[in-house]
Design a protein with these regions (language model features):
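Post-HEXXH active-site segment of zinc metalloproteases
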Residues: 125-152
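Catalytic zinc-binding patch centered on the HExxH motif and its immediate surroundings
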Residues: 65-92
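Non-catalytic architectural context of zinc metalloproteases
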Residues: 1-24
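Active-site recognition of the HExxH zinc-binding catalytic motif
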Residues: 44, 113-126, 156-157
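Acidic helix-start/capping segments at beta-turn-to-alpha-helix junctions
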Residues: 20-29, 33-42, 49-72, 139
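Pan-zinc metallopeptidase signature
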Residues: 2-6, 186-229
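Short helix/loop segments within enzyme catalytic domains
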Residues: 151-187
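Short pre-active-site segment immediately N-terminal to the catalytic Zn-binding motif
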Residues: 96-114, 147-148
């Protein structure tokens, strides 16, 4: 599909400083998410504007299971999601505390990758790709819904990796943090996934690698790629 975001140029590096907090309380998680969202807004705004679209900021909320959102009740399976109804990104802050059990680096990088992905959905919403996705989804039924879902999700992750590649230095994505990024960026519909709606680990790895290197949404037109899992 054609969209001006693909020719809008690279995502810029920004002065991105996130607090080195332990992600075990709602207050700490909200502080971390707020700081990182600010980085995402400042980096993506000029790209979206160059695509000919007015930039609208997102919001981010650290919530727990059972919380009411503009897109319904936040459930156990949700982990994190973008809600187009209020341009809100919702995170299960208690789950991030569980990630701290795997190590502080793992918890922080998981949050960065997930937040960058969800903000990728915000970019899709702003530039009209989400409307295109809704149209494609409405043209099919049953399991055929999975293909447009995979393309949509892979693209959001790809946009996230374009930002992370551009901001590798300010986010210190080197050494153990870079290895943690590679692990998270490769995560997909591992067998036996109940629904193959986010793309295979191989597809996620390939799109992430291309975007991280290119630092540009030009590397992320998943809609014209050959069909894959």
């Amino acid at each position: 599909m054609r969209n001006r975001i693909y020719s809008a140029g690279q995502v810029p590096a920004v002065a991105c400083v996130v607090p080195d907090v332990v992600l075990r309380s709602q207050k700490a998680v909200q502080r971390y998410l707020n700081a990182f969202q600010d980085c995402l807004q400042r980096a993506w705004k000029p790209v979206v504007v160059r695509a000919g679209v007015r930039f609208r900021p997102s919001a981010v909320y650290a919530v727990r299971q059972g919380s009411k959102t503009a897109c319904g009740t936040f459930a156990e399976k949700d982990h994190a999601y973008y809600c187009p109804a209020d341009s809100g990104i919702y995170f299960d802050w208690e789950e991030l505390g569980q990630w701290e059990d795997y190590g502080h680096v793992a918890a922080q990088v998981y949050t960065l990758v997930t937040m960058a992905h969800e903000f990728g959905h915000h970019v899709q919403e702003l530039v009209g790709i989400s409307t295109y996705y809704d149209d494609r989804w409405g043209e099919v039924a049953g399991s055929a819904h999975l293909e447009p879902m995979r393309r949509h999700e892979l693209q959001a992750s790809c946009f996230g990796s374009a930002f992370l590649g551009a901001n590798q230095t300010p986010l210190d994505l080197y050494g153990a943090r870079y290895e943690a990024y590679l692990s998270e960026a490769s995560y997909g519909d591992h067998p036996p996934a109940t629904a193959r709606d986010h793309g295979s680990p191989q597809s996620n790895t390939e799109w992430a690698a291309a975007a991280f290197t290119a630092m540009s949404p030009a590397a992320c037109n998943t809609w014209v790629a050959p069909r894959a899992g």
